[in-house]
């Protein structure tokens, strides 16, 4: 059978550009069909309501993944309201500010995956232009991938796919991704590689704190510009750390790779020149 997945992208976090791609990395998987609706960079209640209702009422997938910043904000709360009442299993993927609402999401009958290392961007006009935005998100994606956070998200969604295929009740994940959960998913062979990935994760968490200070808590331009700039420098070095971790794994031919088979099964390999099984 073919499982129909609906993905709602409202606003943007680092995981947003790759949440659908990580399910079908070579575009040759024949057991899923993905439909994506979004509201661009905005995530106001009106924009979110429009795309969420269209997903529930018109596309009607087997399950829905909503992804965006701060699940506790007004726009995402509107999405949660619609998805909770929609009769379609749904999971909310968000960043650390959503942790305070995780119990409420569970009470609404929704799953959640909250990524602590997916930080807020330094959204000050005097600093952030399209190039800086793209470079920041590229660094965040590298951290998500290299620490294992991306793999945790992918596994959670794949578990939902497999349940549909097997005719079972869809498991709604209830996951807060910490550095321990992330690195466990990466199956590091070298303990130093694991330590570097953990350090990168914690650095990315700190980036969010710095950007909150620069964007919301500091009013003077001469103070907040260097604050948000320092946050972006921090994520750049976190991305370098995950590169170092992967290079350590490459040096002993021990990089964990888990590609999807054409039928959707998750395969496994570590040696570069071996076939995944």
Curated annotation (Swiss-Prot):
Its EC number is 1.5.98.1. Pfam families: MTD. GO terms for molecular function: ferredoxin hydrogenase activity; methylenetetrahydromethanopterin dehydrogenase activity. It catalyses: 5,10-methylenetetrahydromethanopterin + oxidized coenzyme F420-(gamma-L-Glu)(n) + 2 H(+) = 5,10-methenyl-5,6,7,8-tetrahydromethanopterin + reduced coenzyme F420-(gamma-L-Glu)(n). It comes from the Archaea. The keyword Kinase does not apply. The keyword Secreted does not apply. GO terms for biological process: methanogenesis, from carbon dioxide; one-carbon metabolic process. Keywords: Methanogenesis, One-carbon metabolism, Oxidoreductase. Pathway: One-carbon metabolism; methanogenesis from CO(2); 5,10-methylene-5,6,7,8-tetrahydromethanopterin from 5,10-methenyl-5,6,7,8-tetrahydromethanopterin (coenzyme F420 route): step 1/1. It is an enzyme of class 1 (oxidoreductase). Catalyzes the reversible reduction of methenyl-H(4)MPT(+) to methylene-H(4)MPT. NCBIfam families: PRK00994.1. Belongs to the MTD family. This is F420-dependent methylenetetrahydromethanopterin dehydrogenase. The lineage of its organism: Archaea, Methanobacteriati, Methanobacteriota, Methanomada group, Methanococci.
